[in-house]
């Protein structure tokens, strides 16, 4: 069983304290992170794969320290941004899916195999040679997710992956997340989507205010927000 640990983690940007003395262990398969804007939730998930490093305290993934073992952690933890344009780096779909794989020292045959598998799994074969910038927002997000899944990390972090999407594409992306074999940590405001998760962390002013199963956490979150 994998485990992500935060040990007395504080995150400060200038004079602003974004996270305060966070100690928590994450072992569940589906974990949601919610809270008001500015509550610290995005900073929290960015610490998991080393996109940001803690000002104080320690973050580890399966025993690997995000500071000391940065490269190994990034291979274990994939990250999907809210805006796929922040993640897509090459002009064609197939090229973009291959990009990250080339950093894993895989053979050309293995890269091609993984790309073909991903294209088929997510019904993207027809877009294989398409320019990414011509795709819809939902299709772009699917390409961004696919590029991470193809690298076969143990964990995937999603920072509000459906916020910019219409209802149809939002449903498609949430379905993809639900079917992932990997552990998923998801920042989202879509409470309906999160009802089937294993655990929800609610952030408020840089602290974990609620940590419970969805039925309890969502009810308490709504009560506090009303």
UniProtKB/Swiss-Prot annotation:
<feature type="domain" description="ABC transporter">
    <location>
        <begin position="4"/>
        <end position="225"/>
    </location>
</feature>
<keyword id="KW-0997">Cell inner membrane</keyword>
<dbReference type="GO" id="GO:0043190">
    <property type="term" value="C:ATP-binding cassette (ABC) transporter complex"/>
</dbReference>
<keyword id="KW-0472">Membrane</keyword>
<protein>
    <recommendedName>
        <fullName>Putative ABC transporter ATP-binding protein BQ02700</fullName>
        <ecNumber>7.-.-.-</ecNumber>
    </recommendedName>
</protein>
<keyword id="KW-0547">Nucleotide-binding</keyword>
<dbReference type="Pfam" id="PF00005">
    <property type="entry name" value="ABC_tran"/>
</dbReference>
<dbReference type="InterPro" id="IPR050095">
    <property type="entry name" value="ECF_ABC_transporter_ATP-bd"/>
</dbReference>
<dbReference type="InterPro" id="IPR027417">
    <property type="entry name" value="P-loop_NTPase"/>
</dbReference>
<comment type="similarity">
    <text>Belongs to the ABC transporter superfamily.</text>
</comment>
<dbReference type="InterPro" id="IPR003439">
    <property type="entry name" value="ABC_transporter-like_ATP-bd"/>
</dbReference>
<dbReference type="InterPro" id="IPR017871">
    <property type="entry name" value="ABC_transporter-like_CS"/>
</dbReference>
<keyword id="KW-0813">Transport</keyword>
<dbReference type="GO" id="GO:0016887">
    <property type="term" value="F:ATP hydrolysis activity"/>
</dbReference>
<dbReference type="InterPro" id="IPR003593">
    <property type="entry name" value="AAA+_ATPase"/>
</dbReference>
<comment type="function">
    <text>Probably part of an ABC transporter complex. Responsible for energy coupling to the transport system.</text>
</comment>
<keyword id="KW-0067">ATP-binding</keyword>
<dbReference type="InterPro" id="IPR015856">
    <property type="entry name" value="ABC_transpr_CbiO/EcfA_su"/>
</dbReference>
<keyword id="KW-1278">Translocase</keyword>
<keyword id="KW-1003">Cell membrane</keyword>
<feature type="binding site">
    <location>
        <begin position="35"/>
        <end position="42"/>
    </location>
    <ligand>
        <name>ATP</name>
    </ligand>
</feature>
<dbReference type="GO" id="GO:0042626">
    <property type="term" value="F:ATPase-coupled transmembrane transporter activity"/>
</dbReference>
<dbReference type="GO" id="GO:0005524">
    <property type="term" value="F:ATP binding"/>
</dbReference>
């Amino acid at each position: 069983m994998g485990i992500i640990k935060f040990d007395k983690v504080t995150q400060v940007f200038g004079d602003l304290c974004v996270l305060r003395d966070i100690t928590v262990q994450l072992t569940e398969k589906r974990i949601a992170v919610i809270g008001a804007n500015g509550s610290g939730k995005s900073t929290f998930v960015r610490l998991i794969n080393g996109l940001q490093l803690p000002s104080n305290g320690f973050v580890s993934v399966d025993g690997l320290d995000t500071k000391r073992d940065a490269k190994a952690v990034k291979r274990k933890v994939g990250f999907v941004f809210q805006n796929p344009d922040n993640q897509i780096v090459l002009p064609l779909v197939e090229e973009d899916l291959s990009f990250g794989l080339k950093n894993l020292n895989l053979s050309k045959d293995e890269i091609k195999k993984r790309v073909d598998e991903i294209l088929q799994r997510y019904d993207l074969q027809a877009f294989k040679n398409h320019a990414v910038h011509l795709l819809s927002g939902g299709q772009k997000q699917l390409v961004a997710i696919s590029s991470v899944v193809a690298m076969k990390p143990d964990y995937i972090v999603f920072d509000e992956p459906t916020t910019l999407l219409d209802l149809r594409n939002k449903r498609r992306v949430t379905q993809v997340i639900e079917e992932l074999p990997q552990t998923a940590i998801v920042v989202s405001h879509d409470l309906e989507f999160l009802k089937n998760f294993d655990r929800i962390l609610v952030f408020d002013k840089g602290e974990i205010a609620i940590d419970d199963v969805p039925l309890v956490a969502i009810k308490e979150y709504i009560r506090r927000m009303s």
